[in-house]
């Protein structure tokens, strides 16, 4: 059983050639496989912001996937920020 203390919110900013290559769709698929809720949003400057909430271990696995060589496009750098989950998220959306 996952307690509230084991829940986390990951915000990751993915830099590189990650727009127009299916990166957000790929991220959504990985997040849903891991049981996470959140979003993947295109930002200016060839960045995608990924927000995911759920079990910390699942968020860590998503972060590993974002940094892996298996992503669509070409990831140069992933910056991360961890915080307490805010809740209210359902599903995983592409924006």
Swiss-Prot record:
Q: Name one Pfam family in it.
A: Acylphosphatase
Residue ranges of the Acylphosphatase-like domain? 9-95
> Is Lipoprotein a UniProt keyword of this protein?
no
Give the reactions, separated by semicolons, that this protein catalyses.
an acyl phosphate + H2O = a carboxylate + phosphate + H(+)
Which InterPro entries does the entry mention?
Answer: Acylphosphatase, Acylphosphatase-like_dom, Acylphosphatase-like_dom_sf, Acylphosphatase_CS
- Tell me where on the tree of life, at the top rank, the source sits: Bacteria
Q: Enzyme class, one word?
A: hydrolase
What's its EC? 3.6.1.7
| Active site (catalytic residues) | 24, 42
Listed A to Z, the keywords are: Hydrolase
Gene3D superfamilies (alphabetical): 3.30.70.100
One term of GO molecular function: acylphosphatase activity
User: Which NCBIfam families does the entry mention?
Assistant: PRK14422.1
Q: What family is it from?
A: Belongs to the acylphosphatase family.
Identification of the protein by name: Acylphosphatase
Give the species this sequence originates from: Saccharopolyspora erythraea (strain ATCC 11635 / DSM 40517 / JCM 4748 / NBRC 13426 / NCIMB 8594 / NRRL 2338)
Q: What is the lineage of its organism?
A: Bacteria, Bacillati, Actinomycetota, Actinomycetes, Pseudonocardiales
